[in-house]
């Protein structure tokens, strides 16, 4: 029995074809909006945008969906953390400083924690459906520890050059 939100395609509410069309339209709109950022960040953003779009599709579609083969956490870390934060900063500043890279890693770790909580909840159903998440591979105890370590690491990364922030880690 599923405790999370209803899965539209799996439940038959939406056909796979309709979901694909909706996903491609949404991705197309996102790409069109993203192309306007080339005016601010330069043409280097075009190949970055293509890579982002390809990984958006590869995350849950195609012959080898990353989210079903234990690569969801890494993908979320890279694209919701490093790329999202660093490209945003680059577009505005024209460069990316070390502290931005560290901060983006922290954001990526916190994003992975959100995915871990979701996969923790869905562990049994994912295992039955052969969706191999890191929680399915390594278990709930590993997920608990990962959530803790990711949270502490995110605070440490944010406080790298501001040691007083690390005081928040003291219980």
Residue ranges and their predicted role:
Residues 171:
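Conserved small/polar residues in nucleotide/adenosyl-binding loops
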